[in-house]
């Protein structure tokens, strides 16, 4: 592949709602620049970007895909991202590797849930953005309505730099508000014409908006604009670039992926107006002294691994954004996170599933490296003599948890390793072994996320697995008191067994576990046997009498007993303690406890009533509500874990996909009587 320096590179993430046409836009751009010989389609399985079995089956993007192409002497790296909330981790990772984003919006649907989410992610990174209004050929397409909706929602910095020629079935091209000419597609050829007379009013209105927006962020242009002086094409372009780079102006373009209209103009605009990585400085930590340091493109080599794919044949495939310096094949680099040296045997530029060898790559480029041994997503590669460590991306919380197990006996030994490799590829998945319940759990962003993970286990690693509802770690305790004797006596000639204890049971403090005390006087139970009594108490209380769950928050006092000089032993007193528990706990009003979790739910304020109502139906209680901004509310609530099964799905439904939450263990509380009866009956079957 041709060698490109930093000024000749453009990196853009294609983001937006599902089915807005992100993949189709990338496919059109690849075709227009000659990287492919046809426009692939996700719907018929011919896309070069959506090629994984799970994507072909569902006809949707699941994994972000790198699409590199050459255009007018520049290299454009597109990262096509998913548009469904379960895979937002892919979107965040892609944005960290790019200097700008193309937000794709449907001309028929306007702003949707993932449009808003992707915009906010890019805004958090202060990334320049352009908007591409797709599907201009569709029935009910309305460019001007969508532009107004965007301006009302995201601000007046959003401004068209082109407007459509025609709409719906008559859509045939775009009018460029900067060059003041039109680009029309006729018989698959892009032709350039002057603005037709019938469009001049629309063009004048739109150009006035563009001039006004550019002037607002450029003092020199503002002065000329207010004085009515003519503003040249060069001045408009310069002001536009300044506004875009500073994330003040967000240009709007349009087209149709179905008709192949607008993509030469899109790529020309990317080269002309979107930022180059050359001027971007990257901040990191010097691992030698933990001080903050800056790296510019001309400095020593450093790069950030933003994505990993585990290939069943090749192994680990790492996607690297080079932030400074130059990377050459057959060289060695240092991983400042694992503190290991890695060998770069080869570099590749990617066009979806196709790869092209690349001998050298410069700062700003995005490349693929295979067979790294000690490098995972989020790691920094650098020059060992001048080390740096970049902060890894923060992924969305894993809100949906299920238990997982091998569906076949033959896969039981393989599932652990397969899951580890899957997490290498997708950091938004988390695996946890609950030693108490015995469940192996897998957590993800949503239900679809875990369904896809199960399919990947089979397709990539040949492991058949199934999901099921994880068990809940209930507890048992007492609400009353009792005093009982536990006597173990076996004396039938010869050396016998004798242990006799009196135990008092009473409720303990919340969170205190099992508290054992002794108030023996007069040697009723010899000192050497008291540890055996305590051991018997603690071991027996691990299995409660109601449903077999561990007993907690209970005080046990050994206050009396008796012994035999010959027949008493540690085992006899341990057994006596167990007998006392089995007799005394039923008399002390035993109850079942369930775990409560604290939820912090972030939602648009509009949905607060529905979400609070939903919490109430789940036996939850609201602890606090706050509104950190005019359109965002945070609800803090405590809810029993038993009611949170599939809450991620419930919240998504209640908020149209706009809500998220985190949860952490809070405490245990008594289970209501009717529910307790059901749990006890189920466990005693």
Task: Label the predicted regions.
Residues 1-685:
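Structural and coupling elements of P-loop NTPases
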């Amino acid at each position: 592949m041709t060698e490109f320096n930093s000024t000749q590179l453009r990196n853009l993430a294609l983001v937006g709602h599902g089915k807005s046409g992100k993949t189709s836009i990338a496919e059109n751009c690849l075709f227009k620049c000659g990287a492919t010989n046809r426009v692939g389609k996700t719907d018929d399985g011919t896309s070069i970007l959506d090629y994984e079995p799970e994507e072909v089956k569902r006809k949707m993007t699941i994994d972000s895909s790198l699409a590199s192409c050459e255009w007018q002497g520049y290299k454009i790296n597109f990262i096509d991202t998913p548009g469904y909330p379960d895979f937002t981790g892919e979107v965040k990772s892609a944005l960290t590797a790019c200097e700008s984003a193309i937000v794709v919006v449907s001309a028929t649907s306007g702003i949707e849930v993932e449009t808003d989410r992707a915009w906010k992610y890019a805004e958090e990174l202060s990334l320049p953005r352009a908007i591409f209004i797709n599907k201009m050929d569709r029935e009910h397409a309305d460019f001007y309505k969508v532009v107004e909706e965007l301006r009302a929602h995201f601000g007046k910095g959003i401004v068209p730099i082109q407007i459509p020629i025609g709409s719906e079935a008559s859509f045939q091209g775009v009018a460029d508000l900067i060059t003041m000419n039109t680009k029309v597609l006729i018989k698959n050829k892009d032709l350039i014409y002057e603005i037709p007379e019938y469009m001049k009013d629309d063009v004048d209105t739109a150009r006035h908006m563009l001039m006004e927006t550019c002037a607002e962020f450029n003092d020199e242009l503002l002065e000329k604009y207010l004085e009515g002086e003519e503003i040249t094409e060069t001045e408009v372009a310069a002001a536009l670039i300044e506004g875009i780079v500073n994330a003040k102006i967000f240009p709007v373009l349009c087209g149709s992926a179905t008709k192949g209209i607008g993509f030469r103009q899109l790529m020309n605009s990317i080269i002309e107006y979107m930022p180059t990585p050359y001027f971007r400085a990257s901040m990191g930590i010097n691992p030698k002294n933990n001080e903050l340091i800056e790296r510019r493109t001309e400095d020593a080599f450093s790069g950030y691994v933003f994505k990993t794919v585990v290939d069943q044949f090749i192994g680990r495939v790492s996607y690297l954004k080079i932030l400074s310096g130059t990377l050459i094949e057959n060289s060695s680099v240092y991983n400042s996170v694992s503190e290991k040296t890695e060998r770069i045997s080869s570099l590749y530029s990617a066009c979806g599933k196709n790869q092209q060898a690349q001998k050298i790559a410069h700062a700003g480029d995005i490349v693929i490296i295979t067979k790294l041994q000690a490098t995972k997503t989020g790691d920094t590669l650098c020059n060992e003599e001048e080390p740096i460590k970049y902060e890894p991306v923060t992924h969305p919380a894993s809100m949906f948890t299920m238990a997982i197990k091998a569906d076949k006996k033959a896969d039981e030994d393989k599932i652990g390793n397969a899951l580890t490799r899957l997490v290498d590829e997708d950091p938004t998945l988390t695996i946890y072994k609950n030693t108490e319940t015995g469940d192996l759990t897998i957590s993800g962003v949503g239900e679809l996320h875990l369904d896809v993970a199960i399919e990947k286990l089979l397709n990539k690693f040949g492991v058949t697995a199934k999901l099921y509802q994880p068990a809940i770690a209930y507890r048992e305790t007492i609400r009353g008191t009792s005093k009982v004797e536990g006597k173990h006596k076996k004396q039938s000639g010869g050396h016998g067994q004798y242990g006799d204890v009196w135990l008092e049971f009473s409720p303990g403090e919340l969170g205190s576990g099992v508290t054992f005390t002794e108030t023996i006087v007069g040697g009723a139970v010899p000192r050497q046997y008291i540890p055996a009594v305590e051991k018997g108490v603690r071991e027996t209380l691990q299995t409660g009498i109601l449903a077999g769950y561990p007993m907690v928050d209970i005080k046990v006092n050994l206050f009396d007993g008796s012994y035999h000089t010959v027949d008493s032993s540690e085992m006899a007193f341990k057994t006596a303690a167990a007998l006392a528990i089995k007799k005394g706990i039923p008399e002390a009003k035993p109850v079942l406890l369930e775990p409560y979790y604290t939820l912090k739910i972030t939602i648009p304020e509009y949905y607060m009533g529905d979400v609070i109502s939903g919490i109430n139906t789940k036996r939850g209680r609201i602890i606090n509500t706050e509104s950190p901004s005019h359109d965002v509310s945070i609800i803090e609530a405590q809810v029993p874990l038993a009611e949170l099964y599939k809450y991620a799905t419930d919240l998504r439904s209640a908020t149209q996909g706009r809500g998220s939450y985190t949860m952490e263990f809070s405490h245990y509380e008594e289970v209501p009587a009717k529910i307790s009866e059901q749990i006890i009956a189920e466990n005693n079957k």
